[in-house]
Amino acid sequence: MSLASIPSPHTGTIDLGPLTIHMYGLTLLVAIAACILLTGYRWTRQGGDWDLILKVAVWGVAAGIVGARAYHDITSWNEVSSPKWKGVFAVWQGGLGVWGGILLGCLVGAYVAHREGASVLKLMDAVAPGLLLAQGIGRWGNWWNQELYGKPTSLPWGLKIDPENRPAQYADFTTFHPTFLYEIIWNLSLAGFLVWLGHHRNIRPPGLFALYVAGYSAFRIFEETVRIDPAHHFLGLRLNLFVAVTLTIVGLVWFARTQRRAPVTT
């Protein structure tokens, strides 16, 4: 039994009179705002304008939420609350697949940027640290919901989970690996590194975005070996582990290729 632990909130909501605030949703809003502010700051430092960032954000965020929920529902259909047609949209209960959100959000955002005549590749590098910042902040939502934690641990930073939120096979354990905290630390560290790299090295776009894909996915390789939440498996391993390995390789190859070709001027 651990002598020290990280406490978990006993509820994921806060009542303010007749208003019930879902902390997962509030965390998501804060994460989105942080991403927009950091991206806007980086973009305007390059001579861009805020109007483009706001236009991209409106469409990209909406598409990202749809993509994230769709990825979760497709890969975890058996976990969607009943009735299923309502559970599909219950984002306040948790359940957003980050890869689906990034894919659809970036595709739609890139389309908007291209339509406005902006450099899509440069914008991708501008947004990369912001995405990591948003993902780091967003993981606090998992803490509020007591979800997506790791295997049992007796380490002093183990996360205390209420009995009703523990898997049946781990009912006798009290503290678990706080994977949400691991990811927060990793994402914020990687975001800081990308900002530093962009300022001190001549990285050709979208090199920073490629490193974001590789770096985040590399962490997920570790995380997927620790998490114990229900997941689809392929060849005895979690499906998301295969996705993480694939994207780590893709990101590294992508980065290498971007740094070999001629600098982007448009």
Where are these regions (language model features)?
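A feature for loop-to-transmembrane-helix boundaries and adjacent hydrophobic helices
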Residues: 1-266
